[in-house]
Amino acid sequence: MEFSRETRRLALQKMQERDLDLLIIGGGITGAGVALQAAASGLDTGLIEMQDFAQGTSSRSTKLVHGGLRYLKQFDVEVVSDTVSERAVVQQIAPHIPKPDPMLLPVYDEPGSTFSMFRLKVAMDLYDLLAGVSNTPAANKVLTKEEVLKREPDLKQEGLLGGGVYLDFRNNDARLVIENIKRANRDGALIASHVKAEDFLLDDDGKIIGVKARDLLSDQEIIIKAKLVINTTGPWSDEIRQFSHKGQPIHQMRPTKGVHLVVDRQKLPVSQPVYVDTGLNDGRMVFVLPREEKTYFGTTDTDYTGDLEHPQVTQEDVDYLLGVVNNRFPNANVTIDDIESSWAGLRPLLSGNSASDYNGGNSGKVSDDSFDHLVDTVKAYINHEDSREAVEKAIKQVETSTSEKELDPSAVSRGSSFDRDENGLFTLAGGKITDYRKMAEGALTGIIQILKEEFGKSFKLINSKTYPVSGGEINPANVDLEIEAYAQLGTLSGLSMDDARYLANLYGSNAPKVFALTRQLTAAEGLSLAETLSLHYAMDYEMALKPTDYFLRRTNHLLFMRDSLDALIDPVINEMAKHFEWSDQERVAQEDDLRRVIADNDLSALKGHQEG
């Protein structure tokens, strides 16, 4: 079904003519999951996103459907049980996206090690039990030092005790979002990107009856009426709630920044994903992951209070990650000049404050560490050894971390909360990508109940555990064979086997629709046939409106195919300009925007500063 710029125009028109059952603010994975289940359950559903879908946070993850093995060190069995159960569901409903990728976890004899060999074995066995893969080919393996080095010979040998291998899954985070969005659109949801909520419409009793929004492409104000409104904006959740709490700061969220860096595989060759302690005795672990012909590694985890739309990779972030990687892979000698791409994302962590947190628990008690840290900071301020800002930050940490075991952001729960304010606004916040379906299911259970009680409308929630996303109509037990069959179909449309296989993996059961475009398209100037098909499918069926949408989120060219990117920039912009009938001024603006994003991802400013 078409999902294009024209679809967007019609959706905005219809949203202004109706009284929706549910308006969703936010088009990341949380909002996309809610939209899919709401539309499939028959709710008259609308969704607005102020940027591109997944642009804010959901395209900036570690790109794993991660089981969370490290939580078992903290005995958070419920967290891991929920996570691996939901991971299995995502495999069922989006079988073309998560791919099994066994993870290697080396163990070192050093201060601050997350696991000893014994604890790792216990954790992996429990993990397998929770994931239902005990006594299967996917079950964990304990490795000797020699076996670890046979798999990854460039790992640091000093202090290496051995390791383990356990089942994990790589993910294409932005594709998971757009496939949920497309399915919601097919089921009748009205969806538009680049539309920003600016205020609420309120009735005489102060209850929300809609939203005042702005079309950021036309700068027109839009009035959207809805019986219920849900806020799924991740790190922006507090800002949206602020609309109806003028002058009263809301601190439900505690965003933390995570940075990943990308280098060529030859510079940092790893044959499989590696999850390893930093070696800095800071209680953290990092991933080193092969993708395409590149290797990426991360993440950092630091509190963030800056611009939510444009989190930046700093020199401190780079120094930290390069220090970790060069310590663990001593022969790599990775420098900032080797970094081909990068990304910085914000985790929408909950600050605590008695939120309903199925991933962590919430005692509501200030931890000793938090309290002691505040006392020490106040003493330092009195002695003129610290600043007022440091005291304010320490107070905020106590206010917003009542259930934390320690101050380290890595220890803050990734749990979710579902709340309703006095004005009727629902907010679904927190959580991890893996949990998105369960979060949406819980929220919609409550929303459907409210629609019946307050508006007399009855709906039956679909079984979202078996409801596939767009592209996901593939037998989960037979993914590789079905993808290969689609690829064979692509060769009949004139594609090479490699190109057909790439498109089949990217689009799943939508691949035949992509191949069918060959009936009306030939290779555009400067593009291969496969690139032309992918671009036009993104514009007409995935609401890609800007070159950055295509290069960064509909595909991963900007992250993991940097070698070929420069040659594609002009041909892609030319084709989009022709398709969308851009003026010369608009074409220049789009190119400037793309080159700014590329410069940010390439860390051009940091590299230039070093050279200067």
Swiss-Prot record:
It is found in: Cytoplasm. It comes from the Bacteria. GO terms for cellular component: cytoplasm. SUPFAM superfamilies: FAD-linked reductases, C-terminal domain (SSF54373), FAD/NAD(P)-binding domain (SSF51905). It catalyses: sn-glycerol 3-phosphate + O2 = dihydroxyacetone phosphate + H2O2. InterPro entries: DAO_C, DAO_C_sf, FAD-dep_OxRdtase, FAD/NAD-bd_sf, G3P_DH_FAD-dep. It comes from Streptococcus pyogenes serotype M3 (strain ATCC BAA-595 / MGAS315). Belongs to the FAD-dependent glycerol-3-phosphate dehydrogenase family. Its cofactor is FAD. This is Alpha-glycerophosphate oxidase. Residues 398-418 are annotated as: Disordered. One of its GO terms (molecular function) is glycerol-3-phosphate oxidase activity. Keywords: Cytoplasm, FAD, Flavoprotein, Glycerol metabolism, Oxidoreductase. It is an enzyme of class 1 (oxidoreductase). NCBIfam families: glycerol3P_ox_1. GO terms for biological process: glycerol metabolic process; glycerol-3-phosphate catabolic process. Its main location: cytoplasm. Residues 398-408 have a biased composition (Basic and acidic residues). Its EC number is 1.1.3.21. FAD binds at residues 21-49.
